[in-house]
Regions:
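Conserved N-proximal alpha/beta basic substrate-recognition cap immediately N-terminal to
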Residues: 8-123, 133-134
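ATP-dependent carboxylate activation and anion-phosphoryl transfer catalytic cores
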Residues: 235-337
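Short internal beta-strands
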Residues: 2-7
Length: 337
């Protein structure tokens, strides 16, 4: 069952709907359309989901749309439907507060980019992450190598309507880690007490990819164009086999730290979004954390789930496998919160 805002339902109602005739096809058994996604916390919607015996799987949209209207305490308490995973861990995805993602990374001893508390402290190239002015649940990014460049770029982006002064005041400033990016999409099974690597992917970002494709002879024409790093999709990728062991060790340390700081800790899918630094030796630097189902449906096309299960397994199917296993062993309480 899919919960969606009106105007976005056609994909699920027409194209992905489950039908039997003349041949079986589709995967969506039902759709609940709401005027806005935040209405999912309405009592009547909650009871409708409960009547359908739903197990809710949160994605990024669930967080960001509800956060426009509710705080995390309200989300955790008013959501009556059982969550697959740890509903109390969602708030740690934020970059503020005493128990945010950085606290878990520090507890786990996972290397992450150095942070600067003010533009005046900038040393070398930094990435600035701030709320987008027009799409508040998305982030706007820009690069700067000095406090002067920070001020100039920020002023231009405010004038262009990309940032606001208030949003910039709470921006995260961190060193820019050089290297290719890779999202390590893990799945922790409390039933098996094992960590799995579901797959790996990397982001496609506008208009960064356009800049990469421009020949050097034409770069002068782009001097007045601001580079954007807003997400547009994902591409399946792989990492060197020699880096799999460090990746698993990083994931295992994260699971242990999350269990200590946000019990019961990680349940099911989470991702450590990393840069592979040049070294030598090469090292994974975690610049972001995802604490729910990943945004990339293409991770099944990397080889790692097949190494474990003998065939490609999507994240959605792996969640279903865990729920069925928990149901059949009377352990649903270990995977639902």
């Amino acid at each position: 069952m899919v919960v969606t805002a009106k105007g976005r339902e056609r994909t699920y109602v027409e194209h992905f709907a489950a039908r039997e005739h003349p041949v079986p096809r589709g995967c969506v058994d039902g759709v609940i359309e709401l005027d806005s996604f935040a209405e999912i916390l309405r009592d009547d919607v909650q009871h409708r989901l409960l009547d359908q015996n739903v197990v809710f799987v949160a994605n990024r949209s669930f967080e960001v749309y509800l956060r426009q209207k509710y705080d995390y305490d309200e989300i955790e308490t008013r959501m009556l439907v059982p969550f697959f995973g740890n509903r109390h861990l969602l708030r740690a995805e934020e970059r503020e507060g005493g128990m945010d993602q950085y606290a878990i990374l520090r507890k786990a001893g996972i290397r992450h980019p150095r942070q600067f508390s003010a533009p005046s402290e900038i040393q070398g190239l930094v990435m600035v992450k701030a709320p987008h002015a027009k799409v508040s649940f998305e982030r706007a990014f820009f690069l700067a190598s000095s406090s002067r460049e920070y001020a100039q770029t920020a002023e231009r982006l405010i004038d262009e309507g990309v940032l606001t002064a208030d949003g910039l005041a709470g921006a995260v400033i961190e060193e820019y880690a050089l290297g290719p990016s890779v999202n390590l999409n893990f799945f922790y099974s409390p039933l098996l007490r094992e960590l799995e690597l579901s797959g790996t992917d990397t982001r496609r970002q506008t208009n960064l990819e356009g800049f990469r494709n421009v020949p050097p002879s034409a770069l002068d024409a782009l001097r007045g164009v601001t580079m954007r790093l807003e997400e547009a999709g994902h591409i399946a990728t792989t990492i060197l086999e020699s880096m799999l062991e460090p990746a698993f060790e990083m994931g295992e340390r994260f699971v242990g730290a999350a269990a200590e700081l946000r019990p019961p800790g990680a349940i099911g899918p989470f991702a450590l979004q990393c840069i592979v630094s040049a070294g030598p030796p090469k090292e994974l630097v975690c610049y972001d954390v995802s604490l729910r189902i990943p945004g990339s449906p293409g991770t099944r096309y990397t080889p790692y789930s097949a190494y474990r299960w003998g065939r490609d397994v999507s994240v959605g199917e792996r969640i279903a496998m865990e729920v069925v296993m928990a149901r059949d062993t009377d352990r649903l309480k270990d995977v639902l919160t």
